[in-house]
C-alpha cells in the first residue's frame, strides 16, 4: 500500500526510501543514482536491488554516498523472506540499521553484508547454477527434472535453471 512504483524519476523527490531495480549495468545504475542524488533530499535512502554490482562503485560519484546501500531481494520476492542489506565503503552504519529495521517491518529477514561480488547468497549458490547447466549440457536429465530435483530434494523455491532463466543469467 505504501510502495509507489514510478516511471518519472522526478516523482522520487519526496521519497524517504528509493529502491532502484534497473538492468544490471553499472553505467545505468550510476546515472540513475547521480540523478536521484541531485533532487532527493540528503536524508532519502538510496538503494539498489542489484545482485552483484558493487555498491561502492554505484555510490562513488554522488552527493552523500553514505546513504547508498543494496537491498537484494530474492526470487520469487513475495515468497522469499531473506533480504541482503549490502553496505558499500561509504555506507553509514545507521543507514544499514534503518534498512534492517524497515525490512523486518516488511516481514523480511535481513542479513547484513559488505559489497563483494555476489554478496552472500549468489556467491555461495553460483556453483549450483553452473552445475545445473553442466548437467543439462551433459544430458544428465531434462531441465524440468533438474529443477524439480533441487526444488523437492534441496528445498529450493525455484529450480536453478528456472531461476537463471528468470533473472537472465
Residue ranges and their predicted role:
Residues 4, 19, 69-71, 111:
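Hydrophobic/aromatic beta-strand patches that form the interior of the parallel beta-sheet core
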Residues 19-20, 48:
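Redox-cofactor binding/interface segments in oxidoreductases and associated redox assembly factors
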Residues 25-102:
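Rossmann-fold NAD(P)-binding glycine/threonine-rich loop
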Residues 64, 85-116, 126-158:
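Internal alpha-helical scaffold of NAD(P)-dependent oxidoreductase catalytic cores
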Amino acid at each position: 500500500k505504501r510502495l509507489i512504483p514510478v516511471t518519472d524519476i522526478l516523482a522520487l523527490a519526496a521519497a524517504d526510501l528509493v529502491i532502484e531495480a534497473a538492468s544490471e549495468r553499472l553505467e545505468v545504475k550510476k546515472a540513475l543514482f547521480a540523478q536521484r542524488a541531485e533532487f532527493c533530499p540528503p536524508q532519502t535512502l538510496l538503494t539498489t536491488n542489484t545482485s552483484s554490482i558493487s555498491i561502492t562503485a554505484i555510490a562513488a560519484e554522488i552527493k552523500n554516498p553514505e546513504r547508498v546501500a543494496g537491498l537484494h531481494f530474492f526470487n520469487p520476492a513475495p515468497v522469499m523472506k531473506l533480504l541482503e542489506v549490502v553496505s558499500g565503503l561509504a555506507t553509514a552504519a545507521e543507514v544499514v540499521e534503518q534498512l534492517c529495521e524497515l525490512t523486518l517491518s516488511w516481514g523480511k529477514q535481513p542479513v547484513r553484508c559488505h559489497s563483494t561480488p555476489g554478496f552472500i547468497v549468489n556467491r555461495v549458490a553460483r556453483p549450483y547454477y553452473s552445475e545445473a547447466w553442466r548437467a543439462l549440457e551433459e544430458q544428465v536429465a531434462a531441465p524440468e527434472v533438474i529443477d524439480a530435483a533441487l526444488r523437492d530434494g534441496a528445498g529450493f523455491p525455484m529450480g536453478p535453471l528456472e531461476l537463471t532463466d528468470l533473472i537472465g543469467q
